[in-house]
């Protein structure tokens, strides 16, 4: 199959690569760009471990083709750090123990990031609803909710609002 040249901005860096049209975004990120934060879990868009942000939307990269991202802005979990400083969402998961085995964490972080862009001051119920597309088999979700609440508070602080 003939490869197609795509140009995509990933974590603020322009990338131009030749990909087969059937290449899934998750494989493009992991194998072509060596960005292995997003995980391959179910490969059916059910678990959310592969969640990334594309043009301001949470997307499950296991069922999204790389060619669909031509001209897009993609943010992965690796992009949630600025010069070694953790984004408030990552800090929240760390401080509130929002993970155990860590397999779901990259997708949870990315969904929480987008969710807080959409709803900067959520209630607990809104957090639970907003995170429903991401599954965790370990934590029982309580600390994940606390982590998102922590991040929401942190993002309201003037010094971290731009983080």
Swiss-Prot record:
Its cofactor is [2Fe-2S] cluster. The keyword Iron applies. One of its GO terms (molecular function) is 2 iron, 2 sulfur cluster binding. Binds 2 [2Fe-2S] clusters. InterPro entries: 2Fe-2S-bd, 2Fe-2S-bd_dom_sf, 2Fe-2S_ferredoxin-like_sf, 2Fe-2S_ferredoxin-type, Beta-grasp_dom_sf, Diverse_Oxidoreductases. It catalyses: CO + a quinone + H2O = a quinol + CO2. It is an enzyme of class 1 (oxidoreductase). Residues 4-80 form the 2Fe-2S ferredoxin-type domain. [2Fe-2S] cluster 2 binds at residues 101, 104, 136, 138. PANTHER family: OXIDOREDUCTASE WITH IRON-SULFUR SUBUNIT (PTHR44379:SF5). Catalyzes the oxidation of carbon monoxide to carbon dioxide. Dimer of heterotrimers. Each heterotrimer consists of a large, a medium and a small subunit. This is Carbon monoxide dehydrogenase small chain. The gene is cutS.
């Amino acid at each position: 199959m003939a490869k197609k040249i795509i140009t995509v901005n990933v974590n603020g860096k322009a990338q131009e690569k030749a990909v087969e049209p059937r290449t899934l975004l998750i494989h493009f990120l992991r194998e072509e760009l060596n960005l292995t934060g997003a995980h391959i879990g179910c490969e059916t868009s059910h678990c959310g471990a592969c969640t990334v942000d594309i043009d301001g939307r949470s997307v499950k990269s296991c069922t999204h083709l790389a060619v669909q991202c031509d001209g897009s802005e993609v943010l992965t979990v690796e992009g949630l750090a600025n010069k070694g400083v953790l984004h408030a969402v990552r800090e929240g998961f760390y401080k509130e123990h929002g993970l155990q085995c860590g397999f779901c964490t990259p997708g949870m972080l990315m969904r929480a990031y987008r969710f807080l862009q959409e709803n900067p001051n959520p209630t607990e119920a809104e957090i639970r609803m907003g995170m429903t597309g991401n599954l965790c088999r370990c934590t029982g979700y309580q600390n994940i909710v606390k982590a998102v609440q922590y991040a929401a508070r942190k993002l309201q602080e003037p010094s971290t609002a731009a983080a």
